[in-house]
């Protein structure tokens, strides 16, 4: 569909609900501006470019969006594709519209930059745009819908990329926002491009049974009208509802069903005036037809995460026909079809309070708030709790994949309470959903009577009885086990609190040690009558600097920890000697310090001794890669790859120190290394991977696999033990010999 569309056609659609002349003039002003800016530009179809923003705005008008959203639709490409500037838009149309257009532009730009694969950064842009102003994404959905409808003018390989992106990202966004009609249209167009054989097969099956199906459903509609309107005198609307092609395919594929086994292809929708009437209608329907057990769903009492509300029941008619009935109010039906967009529907004369509308959506779709919270994690917080584990990209991708792009599962407590979780949730996620304190003490669960560890993935229908222990508490490995953002946040909060407590306790202990050591030194000096040999404080500090101590307190703590004897400490720092004797003592202690580091640490920190050194968990450096040390207030020196993105900012470069691998120690050690494997999914592929790793004696610490929808792309993430970079290359080369594996690469955690 790249047929020409005139502004008058779009205006006619707008005038169905916007009558104010001043508002209509402002919309026309935006159209004239867009037409001027896009003058001379053409689309791949050869059509004038202005056709695209006109169609985008037409869709927005069909959804009854407000005037500012319509104007943003007309202008949504001017910043990206024309010389127009933000300042010019602000001057002509105001800051709100300028911000909307800029928001759409940023999302579009990021999509083009990252189109080769779904990246967490792209997803972040989309969802942060929603959290800031939901209208940005509504405009973007209208934009994408028209681009899909005209996708036939692109090269086949480009069609595939855009169709996959639309199916994996934009249909999921429409679903999350409850925009069912848009979701179905995006899915069906994308599915037709990605899998034309299956698409045409289902179309053929639908067409072959279409007449019979229409007659059958019309018969049931008339039966229900007679029962509800004629006999029960209820004010209702009754009509048929068709299932989308992609949803039929997904149900056939996911549950292994035949076309004839899918009962909700046939469905009747009943619209009532009130919630009370919904339940009255349900009672009348069940009086006249036989309801199927376990096929009743009350989404009015417990709405879906995307705000969807309705009663669903599957019934059997006297003639044996099985069909679904959906019962809802007018408002629920509008929300079911348009979702969040329904909140922004423009009504003439209404107090159109944008801040209030966005606040209402934010409160009801709390996922956006959680994403904003992640965006605002402070540097200090990341320093205090192993910042590498909570990298925004990694956690963002988890949240979006687990909380938004997934189906839901329904799990039962032992007393029959239903708990809703994202698909892929574990026992640990379930425990935290029940209560934070239960989550913190969880050691496992009985699933359907059998004991299972906290990492066990749950499925719908499981009866889960959580087992706890008083001594149990969260640890960093739980961040890998947990799949839901809410559980991750609670674990993170606990670990932060624990770290603060441990650090506080350690400081108190250290202060007491320093105090005691200082008293012991003073007693020793007094007992030996050495006060006359004491040097001044300035000389003491010079001597401390010579052996890499910044202050007397750090040195006294080392003495307290038996790194030096009292006599060594006093002779070295406090007493005056002949120059030759001072140099001799200094040399002896420096040698001792260096040997101690040689024996203990696999990382040598140049110019600093007796300090805690840890391998950073974000980049997991391995011998003998180029590394650098980052001075962390809470954890000493953290060793990163020099190329690690987490230490590239200017403020972090100021806190870096030179470090090197201690070959004498690290040659006998194994180090964690994270890799990602991209492959075409097939039976026994995981078995082949584990066989190769086993043959190479590679110790696997963690492995997860994920198939992306119907596209059969398998991603395996694993952490293995390696001795050095050469060993990693050997493992990588061996994995690449496995058929259907396309990529094996080192990844950040």
From Swiss-Prot:
PROSITE patterns the UniProt entry points to: ACT, HD, TGS
SMART domains: HDc (SM00471), RelA_SpoT (SM00954)
Pathway participation: Purine metabolism; ppGpp biosynthesis; ppGpp from GDP: step 1/1
Domain HD: 49-148
GO biological process: guanosine tetraphosphate biosynthetic process
Source taxon at top rank: Bacteria
GO cellular component, one term: plasma membrane
Coiled-coil stretches: none
CDD domains given in the database record: ACT_RelA-SpoT, HDc, NT_Rel-Spo_like, TGS_RSH
Entry EC no(s): 3.1.7.2
Segments forming domain TGS: 407-468
Cofactor: Mn(2+)
Alphabetical list of InterPro entries matching this protein: ACT-like_dom_sf, ACT_dom, Beta-grasp_dom_sf, HD/PDEase_dom, HD_domain, NT_sf, RelA/Spo_fam, RelA_SpoT
Reaction it catalyzes: guanosine 3',5'-bis(diphosphate) + H2O = GDP + diphosphate + H(+)
Gene Ontology molecular-function annotations: guanosine-3',5'-bis(diphosphate) 3'-diphosphatase activity
Keywords: Hydrolase, Manganese
ACT domain segment(s): 674-749
Keyword Hydrolase: yes
A Pfam family annotated for this UniProt entry: TGS
Family classification: Belongs to the RelA/SpoT family.
NCBIfam families (alphabetical): spoT_relA
Entry function: In eubacteria ppGpp (guanosine 3'-diphosphate 5'-diphosphate) is a mediator of the stringent response that coordinates a variety of cellular activities in response to changes in nutritional abundance. This enzyme catalyzes the degradation of ppGpp into GDP. It may also be capable of catalyzing the synthesis of ppGpp.
Protein's UniProt name: Guanosine-3',5'-bis(diphosphate) 3'-pyrophosphohydrolase
């Amino acid at each position: 569909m790249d047929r020409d569309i005139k502004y008058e056609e779009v205006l006619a659609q707008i005038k169905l609900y916007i009558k104010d002349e001043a508002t209509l003039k402002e919309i026309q002003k935006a159209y004239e501006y867009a037409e001027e800016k896009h003058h001379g530009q053409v689309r791949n179809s050869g059509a004038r470019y202005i056709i695209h923003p006109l169609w985008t705005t037409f869709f927005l008008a069909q959804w009854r969006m407000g005037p500012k959203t319509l104007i943003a639709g007309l202008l949504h490409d001017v910043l990206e594709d024309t010389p127009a500037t933000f300042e010019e838009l602000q001057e002509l149309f105001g800051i709100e519209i300028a911000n909307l257009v800029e928001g759409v532009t940023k999302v579009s730009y990021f999509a083009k930059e990252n189109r080769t694969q779904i990246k967490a950064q792209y997803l972040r842009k989309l969802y942060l745009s929603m959290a800031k102003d939901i209208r940005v994404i509504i405009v973007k959905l209208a934009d994408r819908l028209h681009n899909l409808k005209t996708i036939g003018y692109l090269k086949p390989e480009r069609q595939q990329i855009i169709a996959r992106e639309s199916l994996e990202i934009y249909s999921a966004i429409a679903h999350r926002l409850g925009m069912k009609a848009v979701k179905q249209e995006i899915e069906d167009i994308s599915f037709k491009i990605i899998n034309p054989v299956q698409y045409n097969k289902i179309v053929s099956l639908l067409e072959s049974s279409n007449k019979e199906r229409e007659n059958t459903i019309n018969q049931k509609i008339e039966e229900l009208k007679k029962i509800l309107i004629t006999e029960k005198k209820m004010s209702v609307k009754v009509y048929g509802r068709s299932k989308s092609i992609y949803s039929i395919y997904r149900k056939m594929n996911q549950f292994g069903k035949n076309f004839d086994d899918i009962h909700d292809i046939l469905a009747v929708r009943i619209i009532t005036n009130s919630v009370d009437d919904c339940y009255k209608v349900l009672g009348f329907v069940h009086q006249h037809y036989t309801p199927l057990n376990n096929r009743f769903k009350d989404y009015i009492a417990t709405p879906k995460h995307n705000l969807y509300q309705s009663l669903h029941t599957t019934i059997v008619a006297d003639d044996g026909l099985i069909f679904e009935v959906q019962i809802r109010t007018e408002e629920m039906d509008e929300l079911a079809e348009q979702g969040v967009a329904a909140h922004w529907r423009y009504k003439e004369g209404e107090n159109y309070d944008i801040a209030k509308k966005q606040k209402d959506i934010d409160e009801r779709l709390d996922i956006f708030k959680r994403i904003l919270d992640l965006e605002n994690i402070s540097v200090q917080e990341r320093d205090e709790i192993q910042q590498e584990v909570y990298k925004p990209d990694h956690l963002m991708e988890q949240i979006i994949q687990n909380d938004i792009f997934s189906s839901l599962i329904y799990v039962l407590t032992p007393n029959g309470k239903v708990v809703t979780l994202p698909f892929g949730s574990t026992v640990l996620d379930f425990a935290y959903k029940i209560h934070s304190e239960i989550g913190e003490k969880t050691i496992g669960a009985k699933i359907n009577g059998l004991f299972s560890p906290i990492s066990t993935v749950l499925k719908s229908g499981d009866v889960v009885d959580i087992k706890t222990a008083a001594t149990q508490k969260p640890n960093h490995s739980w961040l890998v086990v947990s799949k839901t953002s809410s559980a991750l946040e609670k674990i993170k909060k606990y670990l932060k609190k624990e770290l603060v407590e441990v650090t506080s306790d350690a400081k108190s202990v250290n202060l007491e040690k320093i105090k005691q050591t200082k008293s012991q030194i003073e007693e020793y000096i007094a007992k030996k009558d050495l006060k006359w040999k004491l040097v001044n404080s300035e000389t003491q500090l010079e001597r401390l600097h010579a052996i890499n101590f910044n202050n007397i307190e750090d040195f006294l703590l080392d003495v307290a920890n038996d790194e030096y004897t009292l006599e060594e400490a006093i002779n070295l720092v406090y007493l005056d000697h002949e120059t030759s004797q001072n140099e001799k003592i200094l040399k002896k202690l420096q040698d001792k310090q260096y040997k101690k580091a040689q024996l203990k640490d696999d990382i040598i920190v140049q110019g600093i001794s007796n300090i805690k050194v840890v391998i950073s968990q974000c980049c997991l450096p391995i011998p003998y890669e180029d590394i650098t040390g980052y001075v962390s207030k809470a954890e000493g020196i953290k060793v990163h790859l020099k190329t690690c993105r987490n230490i590239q900012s200017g403020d972090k470069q100021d806190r870096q120190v030179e470090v090197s691998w201690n070959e004498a120690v690290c040659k006998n050690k194994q180090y964690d290394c994270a890799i990602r494997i991209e492959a075409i999914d097939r039976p026994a592929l995981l078995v082949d991977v584990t066989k190769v790793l086993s043959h190479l004696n590679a110790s696997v610490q963690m492995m997860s696999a994920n198939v992306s929808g119907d596209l059969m792309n398998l991603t395996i993430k694993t952490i293995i033990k390696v001795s050095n970079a050469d060993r990693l290359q050997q493992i990588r080369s061996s994995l690449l010999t496995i058929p259907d594996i396309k990529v094996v690469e080192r990844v950040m955690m």
